Amino acid sequence: MTSVIYPGTFDPITNGHLDIIERSAVIFPRVLVAVANSPSKKTLFSLEERVELVRQSVAHLSNVEVFGFSDLLANVIKQHNISAIIRGVRTTIDFEYELQLAALNRLLTKGVESLFFPPAEKWVFVSSTIVREIYLHGGDVAELVPVPVFNALKAR
């Protein structure tokens, strides 16, 4: 079975992320969403909370699995027999950075390719960073995040 992986910090998962996951789930029989533990990043939600929020957000997708990881992505890819890495690219700045990561991951995994998904037009401006900034300044993020994330933010 072809399996792809969509790695990210997802702090929090946004509707842009969810759109990419849903589109990937239509194309591929198995999509793994790998929620990264990034000690160098100051996250709003813990790894466990982020994994659970992603799980709740993709519960309607039967071919999507969610897990957290702290290892090198290349090692996770080898452990799960991954065929390709899914990445979202919003801008040319994203693309340049992702191109470098794709080359590195291809080297470290002995050939696993990265597939770049542009966002749907209505999500092109959405990022986890922007969502956190709006939230931390008291703004309304209801239209930018899945319902489980919005509820978790309201409860904080």
From Swiss-Prot:
It is found in: Cytoplasm. One of its GO terms (molecular function) is pantetheine-phosphate adenylyltransferase activity. The keyword Magnesium applies. Keywords: ATP-binding, Coenzyme A biosynthesis, Cytoplasm, Magnesium, Nucleotide-binding, Nucleotidyltransferase, Transferase. One of its GO terms (cellular component) is cytoplasm. Transmembrane segments: none annotated. GO terms for biological process: coenzyme A biosynthetic process. Signal peptide: none annotated. Its main location: cytoplasm. ATP binds at residues 9-10, 17, 88-90, 98, 123-129. Its cofactor is Mg(2+). Its EC number is 2.7.7.3. Pathway: Cofactor biosynthesis; coenzyme A biosynthesis; CoA from (R)-pantothenate: step 4/5. InterPro entries: Cyt_trans-like, PPAT, Rossmann-like_a/b/a_fold. Substrate binds at residues 9, 41, 73, 87. PANTHER family: PHOSPHOPANTETHEINE ADENYLYLTRANSFERASE. Reversibly transfers an adenylyl group from ATP to 4'-phosphopantetheine, yielding dephospho-CoA (dPCoA) and pyrophosphate. This is Phosphopantetheine adenylyltransferase. It comes from Haemophilus influenzae (strain PittEE). The gene is coaD.
